[in-house]
Amino acid sequence: MKNFLIYGSYGYTGSLIVEQAIKEGMRPLLAGRDERLLRVQAEKFGLEYRAFSIDDTAALDSALREVDAVLHCAGPFVLTYRQMAEACIRTKRHYVDISGEIEGFEALAAMDEEAKCSGIMLLPGGGFDVVPSDCLIAHVAKKLESATHLEIYIKSIGSGVSR
């Protein structure tokens, strides 16, 4: 059994995660809709893959039964989180996504009791919306060319609707 599946593994962030997983000695199961892109990626890293639409419940459940957890990287998450989270609850697999979309955060929080009953964790925002942090890192790297490491700390100063 592979330890986790990356759905959307060939997208920008998914592909970065796959590369880092390989560096760390992990062998994730790659997944997504586009079989051609998956095949190329799988051959590059010597990994297995499963091609299926997130709306194909049988294929989704079958792939999840091969792993312990899912790292969901296929957005826009407003169109994909529910199918994946419901499949994780059905198959008792942990769920982590890289979304920064509040609708998904709220919807997954509403599924908390179902997740607990299945003995799993639903964790949206595992990457704290990667675009802002990527932009910050790129900006800092240009300003501090000799730097070799960067640590980011984030503090919330309240919330609400921005206007």
Where would I find each of the regions flagged by the language model?
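Conserved anion/nucleotide-ligand pocket segment
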Residues: 127-129, 135-163
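Rossmann-fold NAD(P)-binding glycine/threonine-rich loop
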Residues: 99-121
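Helix C-cap/helix->beta junction micro-motif
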Residues: 24, 45, 90-91, 118, ...
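Hydrophobic residues in well-ordered beta-strands that form the structural core
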Residues: 30, 72, 96-97, 122-124
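Residues at the starts of beta-strands that form the adenosine-phosphate
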Residues: 3, 27-29, 48, 149
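Conserved glycine-rich Rossmann-like NAD(P)H-binding loop of the short-chain dehydrogenase/reductase
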Residues: 26-37
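NAD(P)H-binding glycine-rich loop region in Rossmannoid oxidoreductase-like domains
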Residues: 36-107
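N-terminal Rossmann NAD(P)H-binding glycine-rich loop of SDR-like oxidoreductase domains
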Residues: 4-24
